[in-house]
């Protein structure tokens, strides 16, 4: 599965803690991240991560493009709800794309934990169905 990791500045430490805690599960998947988040997670975990631009410089939109191409399976976006973001329209667009394309989205550590644990159990079969044009064939 392709997993996006995004975190606002005040939530980057939460993302790092999360990635360390779930490193073994995340290691089995292809990881993508916005610039600084990806760098910090990679430094803390040693996991390979495809890094895009930072969020304000278009990284959110780059991940959004993968969502629109049905090439992203899960988005972990630790948002800071208490700080205004200069690129809020990009954030809203990314969340909208997750809704449009039925991509699971966690905006906090609690939800991310539920999604990643279920991913580990193999309960994300619906993504295979979506990728295969509505059939449950995985070949």
Curated annotation (Swiss-Prot):
Molecular function (GO) terms for this protein are: methylglyoxal synthase activity
Say if the entry is tagged with keyword Lyase.
yes
Q: Which residues form the active site?
A: 60
Positions of the MGS-like domain = 1-139
Question: What are the record keywords, sorted?
Answer: Lyase
Disulfide feature: none
Top-level EC class as recorded in UniProt: lyase
Which residues of the sequence carry a binding annotation for substrate?
A: 8, 12, 34-37, 54-55, 87
Please state which protein family the record places this protein in: Belongs to the methylglyoxal synthase family.
Any idea what job this protein has?
Catalyzes the formation of methylglyoxal from dihydroxyacetone phosphate.
The record, for NCBIfam families, names:
MGSA, PRK05234.1
**HAMAP family registered for this protein in UniProt:** Methylglyoxal_synth
What is the protein's name according to its record?
Methylglyoxal synthase
Q: Which organism does this record belong to?
A: Bacillus pumilus (strain SAFR-032)
User: What is the name of the gene encoding this protein?
Assistant: mgsA
């Amino acid at each position: 599965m392709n997993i996006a990791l995004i975190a606002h500045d005040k939530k980057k430490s939460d993302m790092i803690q999360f990635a360390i805690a779930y490193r073994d599960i995340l290691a089995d998947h292809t990881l993508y991240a916005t610039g600084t988040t990806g760098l910090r997670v990679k430094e803390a975990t040693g996991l390979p991560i495809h890094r895009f631009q930072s969020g304000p410089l278009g990284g959110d939109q780059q991940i959004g493009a993968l969502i629109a191409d049905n090439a992203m399976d899960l988005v972990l976006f630790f948002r800071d709800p208490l700080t205004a973001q200069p690129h809020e329209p990009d954030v809203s667009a990314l969340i909208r794309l997750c809704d449009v394309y039925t991509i699971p989205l966690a905006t906090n550590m609690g939800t991310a934990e539920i999604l990643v644990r279920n991913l580990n159990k193999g309960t994300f079969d619906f993504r295979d169905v979506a990728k295969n044009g509505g059939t449950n064939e995985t070949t």
